[in-house]
A protein has these predicted regions:
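An N-terminal alpha-helical hairpin/helix-loop-helix interaction module that forms a charged
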Residues: 1-85, 101-170
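A short His-aromatic
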Residues: 98
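Cytochrome P450 catalytic-core helices
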Residues: 92-95
Length: 170
């Protein structure tokens, strides 16, 4: 990726960066299960939409209950299967990354950028495949941030974004 494309991507991300930082500042200070302001900001940033009331209640209560605990992608994924009967790899990763910003997010942009095909929703092994896919995302970030291109992008980001010290490389 050339410098102009990197610069354009960073500039385009500025609004999202401020939204992200606000969420991460609010997270430890509020009871996210009850704080509708936090939920509104989180839902807007991560595009959480069209879920029923029970889904939001379970999601944010679990997010709150896990504060201070070392949780894993697998635990979150299986919790939502057990409590909601749903396969939610993307929202599981977003909850995890809110607790531990060093953990990557699973979304279509990340998958596209690293050429990773998600497990099919109809697969009987989708949970196992999702765990493997998430490990591949983690490995990709670990390798990329040490690569010459990764170092260049991180340095440009750090130089252009004043708040970069509050944002992890994943």
């Amino acid at each position: 990726m050339d410098d102009n494309h990197i610069l354009a991507a960073i500039i385009n991300a500025k609004k999202g960066i401020s939204q992200y930082l606000e969420i991460m500042e609010l997270f430890p200070k509020s009871n996210v299960a009850m704080d509708h302001n936090f939920q509104r900001k989180y839902n807007a940033f991560y595009r959480v939409r069209q879920r029923n009331e029970n889904w939001y209640r379970v999601y944010y209560q679990f997010m709150e209950d896990q504060k201070g605990h070392n949780i894993s992608f697998t635990e979150v994924l299986h919790y939502f299967k057990m409590k909601l009967g749903r396969y939610e790899p993307s929202f599981s990763s977003k909850l995890l990354a809110t607790h531990n910003p060093d953990m990557p997010v699973w979304d279509v942009h990340v998958q596209s950028n690293i050429d990773l095909k998600p497990p099919p929703y109809y697969s009987s092994k989708k949970f196992e495949l999702a765990q493997s896919a998430y490990q591949k995302i983690q490995a990709w970030y670990k390798d990329f941030e040490c690569s010459p291109e990764g170092e260049k992008i991180i340095n440009m980001f750090d130089n252009l974004i004043i708040e970069s010290k509050f944002i992890t490389n994943t």
